[in-house]
From Swiss-Prot:
EC number in record: 2.7.8.13
Organism: Pseudoalteromonas translucida (strain TAC 125)
Catalytic activity as recorded in UniProt: UDP-N-acetyl-alpha-D-muramoyl-L-alanyl-gamma-D-glutamyl-meso-2,6-diaminopimeloyl-D-alanyl-D-alanine + di-trans,octa-cis-undecaprenyl phosphate = di-trans,octa-cis-undecaprenyl diphospho-N-acetyl-alpha-D-muramoyl-L-alanyl-D-glutamyl-meso-2,6-diaminopimeloyl-D-alanyl-D-alanine + UMP
Gene that this polypeptide is encoded by: mraY
UniProt-recorded Gene Ontology molecular function terms: metal ion binding; phospho-N-acetylmuramoyl-pentapeptide-transferase activity; UDP-N-acetylmuramoyl-L-alanyl-D-glutamyl-meso-2,6-diaminopimelyl-D-alanyl-D-alanine:undecaprenyl-phosphate transferase activity
GO CC field: plasma membrane
Protein name per the record: Phospho-N-acetylmuramoyl-pentapeptide-transferase
Cofactor(s) the protein requires to work: Mg(2+)
Source species taxonomy: Bacteria, Pseudomonadati, Pseudomonadota, Gammaproteobacteria, Alteromonadales
Location within or outside the cell: Cell inner membrane
Length: 360
């Protein structure tokens, strides 16, 4: 929004041209989202406490979690507000990639909000029934996938980048819609499953978003993209601002979500953030790289799939409890140890993912 204003004012004072620089807007994006989160965080927490919107804890999980009962939830509203405000202020709103990302974040945020509302306000332990949650996630993913596919104007927008291989860019055709669908729905649910311990989901989200910001910048720069043998997508560079807004909002939320948490993000935050990572990876054509960088999310989701599959097929469980972070808690690991070790794994995987841009 302010980009347009700066363009107009530049004719009167050339100094306003500084706001056309992507790096400056990225920095302002992260600072705006961070400061907004830090300022509004205490106010939101008090409001949630006043309305008695607190987390309900299952009694069949780790006993240490019982003390978390009643902790304010739906803090994801703070994250989404900061992301939207920062992006709308500093991004170029004529860019379709920006709007596609905001649509995914907002629509999945609505799905998560309905789920949280039913759980914590209407006291329905099931929340939004799983089949309906999956239905709306699918509708959102398919709408976005089809819209992007049928409005694509260059071959690079629908090619698949294969990590470790130089100039291997197979055209996906209609399979692009399938890939996009699984990237959005899969990542959204994976982040949702990871959000079970204080700060466990938000830090990997911040790390992956920061890495995607770097990739978006490289992809949107013709010189860097040619040097690294990745598709050149001029619209992708504006996603840097969205990614830095996610990083800033995430850091601000972490201030209140770190152990012991003062607030949880709830499904309104986790579903939206997962969808954000998924759609950005799709737009910069790095869906496969997201599997590496988001390895913690993949590990959490796979642990649930394996646990359920094993129990249905063999009548036996593989883990003491799934998602896998609860397995380690039941083995006797203190919660902070589980959290920090998963953070370390995420740092290593994100760095490994970035390294693949050069190792080809």
């Amino acid at each position: 929004m302010l980009v347009w204003l700066a363009e107009y004012l530049t004719q009167y004072y050339t100094g306003f041209n500084v706001f056309s620089y992507l790096t400056l807007r990225a920095i302002l994006g992260i600072l705006t989202a961070l400061m907004m989160s830090l300022y509004l965080g205490p106010k939101l927490i008090r409001a949630l406490q006043r309305m008695q919107i607190g987390q309900t804890v299952r009694d069949d999980g780790p006993q240490s979690h019982l003390s978390k009962s009643g902790t304010p939830t739906m803090g994801g509203l703070l994250i989404l507000a900061a992301i939207f405000t920062s992006t709308l202020l500093w991004a170029d709103l004529s860019n379709k990639y920006v709007w596609a990302t905001l649509f995914v974040i907002g629509s999945l945020g609505v799905v998560g909000f309905v789920d949280d509302y039913r759980k914590v306000i209407r006291k329905d332990p099931k929340g939004l029934i799983a089949k309906w949650k999956y239905f709306w996630q699918s509708v959102i993913a398919l709408v976005v996938a089809c819209a992007l596919f049928f409005t694509s104007t260059q071959a690079n927008e629908t090619s698949l980048v294969v990590p470790f291989f130089k100039d291997v860019l197979p055209q996906l055709g209609l399979f692009y819609i399938v890939i996009t669908y699984f990237a959005l729905v899969g990542t959204s649910n994976a982040v949702n499953l990871t959000d079970g311990l204080d700060g466990l989901a938000i830090v990997p989200t911040i790390l992956v978003a920061a890495a995607l910001a770097i990739i978006a910048y490289l992809t949107g720069n013709v010189n860097f993209s040619n040097y690294l043998h990745i598709p050149y997508l001029p619209l992708a560079s504006e996603l840097v601002v969205v990614c830095t807004a996610i990083v800033g909002a995430g850091l601000g939320f972490l201030w209140f979500n770190t152990y012991p948490a003062q607030v949880f993000m709830g499904d309104v935050g986790s579903l939206a953030l997962g969808g954000a990572l998924g759609i950005i990876a799709v737009l910069v054509r790095q869906e496969l790289l997201l599997i590496i960088m988001g390895g913690v999310f993949v590990m959490e989701a796979l642990s649930v799939i394996l646990q359920v599959g094993s129990y249905k097929l063999r009548g036996q469980r593989i883990f003491r409890m799934a998602p896998i972070h609860h397995h380690y808690e039941l083995k006797g690991w203190p919660e902070p140890r589980v959290i920090v070790r998963f953070w370390i794994i995420s740092i290593v995987l994100v760095l490994a993912g970035l390294a693949t841009l050069k190792i080809r």
